[in-house]
């Protein structure tokens, strides 16, 4: 299957609808995505399984290849790092690294502009970063890692990610608005 097929879906008006319509082909291209379907996250932050959460995030970001591709892969590693604590609460430690590994493995089969590939990778790796708790030196490192456009994309991804979670935590958007 060609990358253009996936790109056309991601850049459509309602990517989630087109992903679901072409689910068999998408799962053949990205088998790890099928592991996300019906994978319950078992924590108060999430109201959707991993797959539906991903689809909500993809729909929620602006129409940009880097953003939509990052949204598609941002939590794809969760089923592979899932643990539960003694209270049966689900945790996904280091899922951003696993998600990025899956993305890099996937994209290595295709010819995609290096700059876009690097932006997607950075967005996946940093999407779960708790920006408001960063120390000054960490914030400076972040600013050296991302250009201005990428910082904007990171906040757009984080916003869509938060909006696709439990509404009890949407108040955290106020923090993002202050930081932008």
Which residue stretches match the model-derived regions?
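Charged substrate- and nucleic-acid-binding regions of tRNA-handling and nucleotidyl-transfer enzymes
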Residues: 1, 6, 104-109, 162-180
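Acidic/His-rich, divalent-metal-binding segments that scaffold phosphate/diphosphate chemistry
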Residues: 1-91
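Exposed alpha-helical structural elements
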Residues: 5, 17-18, 25-28, 32, ...
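Residue-identity detector for glutamine
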Residues: 25, 41, 132, 156, ...
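Divalent metal-dependent catalytic cores for phosphoryl transfer on phosphate-bearing substrates
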Residues: 59-168
């Amino acid at each position: 299957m060609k990358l253009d097929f996936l790109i056309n879906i991601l850049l459509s008006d309602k990517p989630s609808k087109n992903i679901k319509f072409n689910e068999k082909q998408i799962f053949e291209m990205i088998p790890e995505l099928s592991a996300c379907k019906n994978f319950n996250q078992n924590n108060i932050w999430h109201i959707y399984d991993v797959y539906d959460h991903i689809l909500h995030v993809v729909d929620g970001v602006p129409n940009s290849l880097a953003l939509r591709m990052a949204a598609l892969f941002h939590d794809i590693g969760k089923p592979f790092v899932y643990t539960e604590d003694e209270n049966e609460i689900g945790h996904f430690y280091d899922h951003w690294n696993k998600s990025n590994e899956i993305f890099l493995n996937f994209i290595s089969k295709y010819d995609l502009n290096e700059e876009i590939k690097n932006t997607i990778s950075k967005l996946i790796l940093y999407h779960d970063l708790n920006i408001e708790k960063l120390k000054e030196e960490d914030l400076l490192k972040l600013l050296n890692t991302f250009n201005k456009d990428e910082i904007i994309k990171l906040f757009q991804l984080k916003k869509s990610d938060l909006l696709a979670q439990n509404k009890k935590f949407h108040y955290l958007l106020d923090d993002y608005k202050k930081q932008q």
